[in-house]
Amino acid sequence: MVKAVTVLSGSGGVSGVIHFTQEEDGPTTVTGKLSGLAPGLHGFHVHALGDTTNGCLSTGPHYNPANKEHGAPEDETRHAGDLGNVTVGEDGTAEFTIVDKQIPLIGSGSIIGRAVVVHADPDDLGKGGHELSKSTGNAGGRLACGFIGLQG
């Protein structure tokens, strides 16, 4: 089994820890806990770069090795890094588990060394009709991010 971890930090006290696990050629399981967010839905994506030298702005676009349009996690046409939304409760926290086969930790297309980003607004899953729907899901600003690193 391969494991990875991301420690998220950002503006306004947003923080969290995300764990990734993958068994051989199986899907990747993502578990996380976030805090300091406004209640509601927040876009949650793997971005192409692990560079946080300019905060979350330097993490690049959504991870998209197949050069597809933005979509929902269950859509055939989507960026590999499109993980949809996390639901934040009234207390400002979110706990979640996502299982996804497009974000491997091993082999071709590994997400190790890339970044996770939590956005200010809901991801419209490419279906909102906004000019940004097909590229970013119109998910708004980048509130918190972190580098995806290999874990022992």
UniProtKB/Swiss-Prot annotation:
Enzyme Commission number, as recorded: 1.15.1.1
Protein residues bound to Cu cation: 45, 47, 62, 119
Keyword set, alphabetical order: Antioxidant, Copper, Cytoplasm, Disulfide bond, Metal-binding, Oxidoreductase, Zinc
Gene3D superfamilies in the record: Superoxide dismutase, copper/zinc binding domain (2.60.40.200)
Catalytic activity annotation: 2 superoxide + 2 H(+) = H2O2 + O2
SUPFAM superfamilies named among the record's database cross-references: Cu,Zn superoxide dismutase-like
Transmembrane segments: none
Note accompanying the cofactor annotation: Binds 1 copper ion per subunit. Binds 1 zinc ion per subunit.
UniProt cross-references to CDD domains, sorted A to Z: Cu-Zn_Superoxide_Dismutase
Pfam families: Sod_Cu
Subcellular locations according to the entry: Cytoplasm
GO molecular function: copper ion binding; superoxide dismutase activity
Cofactor(s) the protein requires to work: Cu cation; Zn(2+)
S-S bridge residues: 56-145
Top-level EC class as recorded in UniProt: oxidoreductase
Positions contributing to Zn(2+) binding: 62, 70, 79, 82
Keyword check for Nucleotide-binding: no
Gene Ontology terms: cellular component: cytoplasm
Annotated family: Belongs to the Cu-Zn superoxide dismutase family.
Self-association and partners: Homodimer.
Reported function: Destroys radicals which are normally produced within the cells and which are toxic to biological systems.
Protein name (database record): Superoxide dismutase [Cu-Zn]
UniProt source species: Panax ginseng
Gene name linked to the record: SODCC
